[in-house]
């Protein structure tokens, strides 16, 4: 009995560029401000896919803290991908967060003190994120596919020949899948950080999920599903 094994390998080439600016400053004695702005470009190429896959984006964050007690932050991502049609290629995804470090309040220090309550912070954030994961490569463009040798019939005798025909279904309106995320909670440390507690509530609502709209004929076993569309929710 003869056995045969086959082995193969593939190469992935990644080219990544990132550049950023950072700013920090203390205004007076109680106003702490900072900002970060970053540009990123990513390119991936594999042996089986000659055309590179590009992503690029601009990411920013601005933070403010007053007297180490009251915190506020705004962040955003302006992301681009060639997986989407030109008019929808870039998406803007902002987020905001607030925080309150209660243990830094003078009345807490006077009444409870740092020995019992080392640290307590309340926080909350709300933001929008987007992803192009799961979108087939160049799905927004029509394609041609090579047919078999008996696809077309010509002449009186019906000679069978191959050729090219319409490829897989496509969707010129495909866009980002988006998620709204809410997160609120508190962090507590007691007795000089000997005990740590944390409470967190998280909620996510996703829309424009890429899925297929099945027709009655498809469900009954005839026909085929339509193109992937951004119609799903969770």
Spell out what each predicted region is.
Residues 1-234:
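Extracellular/periplasmic, surface-exposed regions of secreted and cell-surface proteins
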């Amino acid at each position: 009995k003869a056995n045969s094994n086959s082995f193969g390998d593939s190469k992935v080439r990644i080219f990544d560029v990132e550049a950023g600016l950072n700013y920090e400053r203390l205004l007076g004695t109680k106003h702490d401000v900072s900002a970060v702005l970053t540009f990123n470009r990513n390119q991936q190429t594999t042996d089986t896919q000659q055309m590179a896959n590009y992503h690029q984006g601009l990411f920013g964050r601005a933070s403010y803290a007053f007297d180490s007690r009251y915190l506020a932050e705004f962040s955003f991502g302006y992301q681009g991908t060639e997986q989407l049609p030109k008019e929808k290629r870039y998406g803007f995804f902002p987020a905001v967060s607030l925080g309150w470090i209660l243990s830094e309040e003078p009345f807490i220090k006077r009444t409870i003190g740092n020995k019992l309550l080392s640290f307590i912070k309340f926080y909350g954030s709300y933001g929008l994120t987007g992803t192009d994961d799961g979108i087939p490569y160049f799905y927004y463009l029509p394609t041609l596919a090579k047919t078999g040798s008996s696809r077309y019939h010509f002449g009186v005798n019906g000679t069978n020949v191959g050729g090219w025909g319409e490829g897989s279904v496509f969707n010129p309106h495909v866009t980002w899948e988006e998620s709204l995320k809410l997160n609120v909670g508190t962090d507590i440390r007691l007795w000089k950080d000997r005990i740590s507690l944390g409470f967190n509530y998280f909620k996510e609502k996703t829309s424009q999920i890429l899925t297929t709209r099945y027709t009655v004929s498809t469900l009954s076993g005839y026909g085929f599903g339509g193109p992937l569309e951004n119609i799903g929710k969770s």
